[in-house]
Amino acid sequence: MTIKLAIDCMGGDHGVSVTVPAAISFLSSHDDAEMILVGLPDAIGAQLKKLHATDHPRVTVVPATEVITMDDPVEVALRKKKDSSMRVAATQVKEGKADACISAGNTGALMAVSRYVLKTLEGIERPAIATTIPNEQGWGTTVLDLGANADCEPGHLLQFARMADAMVSVVDHKEHPTVGLLNIGEEVIKGNEVVKAAGELLRASELNFYGNVEGNDIFKGTTDIVVCDGFVGNVALKSTEGLAKMIGSMIKEEFTRSWFTKLLAVVAMPVLSRLARRLDPARYNGASLLGLRGLVIKSHGSADAHSFEWAIKRGYDAARNGVIERIARAFAHKSGAGGAATGSPETDAPNPHPDSRAA
């Protein structure tokens, strides 16, 4: 089975200088992958020449004449830049030419463009952004939503949980993964009305619901999945990133304070190296836009080639394991957010493959 990946080569802070080398490097370790490099042909070609990959048999260059910058508002991305590398890459997925799209571009634009081009799966009202955050268990906690939906209804949180359950089941090979609802306490009576109502829906659902969890449970690995609205999730994610940078900076500062601490650093290097590998942010790069009729992976905008390659791997793994089909089946007999609250059945099974109706 060949996995074809459409790369938005112009997205992110570094564009082709990161995306193209990452794509070529990924091909060297994955014989069943093909790359569709989307963007300005001259810029992509120059990078391929540097990498001696101009005639790579598993690389196709698809031209796009426009670039969505990190500062472009959503309306510009949607209405004015219709031939952007981001949009063309998403269209490759819609037309069945690619199995997944990976972009380091503007998050808001990517969500808007992807939703416009691919549409949502039937039964899903709102797509959500999900990623994995490292935990003490070593396998990471899947957290969503991370910013796509600042305000949610209880049924939306139930839908997010179902989408994450489907993804974790096939990608991480965990049958019946545990689901936690992010709250200000474990007690059922804690939280605002939306969270309390969402808890009732989750307890009544077919999911393996653990109950309410707190922020520290994300890092303890108390549950496989943690669900929250996009406002809370984005704050949690940015706080995590900030804390990680601060701790790294403080450790470096302390170990370089004097000749003695530098000597200690040499002695502690094996331990520090193992810790660095466990907490390497590059390994967790790549957030999945769940709920669409095609796979879209969002890389961190400041990612280097090593980090972007991990985002490519996330798209590859999701495509290889049939995440879209699994989510579609999970919602085949479920309704939208309102129906999810009442448990009414959905009459039409979702179509996991984009077609002319998703134009």
From Swiss-Prot:
Name the record gives this protein: Phosphate acyltransferase
One GO cellular component term noted in the UniProt record for this chain: cytoplasm
Pathway assigned to this chain's UniProt record: Lipid metabolism; phospholipid metabolism
EC annotation from Swiss-Prot or TrEMBL: 2.3.1.274
Family statement: Belongs to the PlsX family.
HAMAP family: PlsX (MF_00019)
Subunit structure of this chain's protein: Homodimer. Probably interacts with PlsY.
Major enzyme class: transferase
Region feature (Disordered): 335-359
GO biological process: fatty acid biosynthetic process; phospholipid biosynthetic process
Catalysed reactions, as listed in the record: a fatty acyl-[ACP] + phosphate = an acyl phosphate + holo-[ACP]
Keywords: Cytoplasm, Lipid biosynthesis, Lipid metabolism, Phospholipid biosynthesis, Phospholipid metabolism, Transferase
InterPro entries in the cross-refs: FA_synthesis, Phospholipid_synth_PlsX-like
Domain of life: Bacteria
Pfam family, one: FA_synthesis
Compartment(s) of residence: Cytoplasm
Primary site of residence: cytoplasm
Gene name for this UniProt entry: plsX
Entry function: Catalyzes the reversible formation of acyl-phosphate (acyl-PO(4)) from acyl-[acyl-carrier-protein] (acyl-ACP). This enzyme utilizes acyl-ACP as fatty acyl donor, but not acyl-CoA.
GO molecular function: phosphate:acyl-[acyl carrier protein] acyltransferase activity
Taxonomic lineage: Bacteria, Pseudomonadati, Pseudomonadota, Betaproteobacteria, Burkholderiales
Keyword Transferase: yes
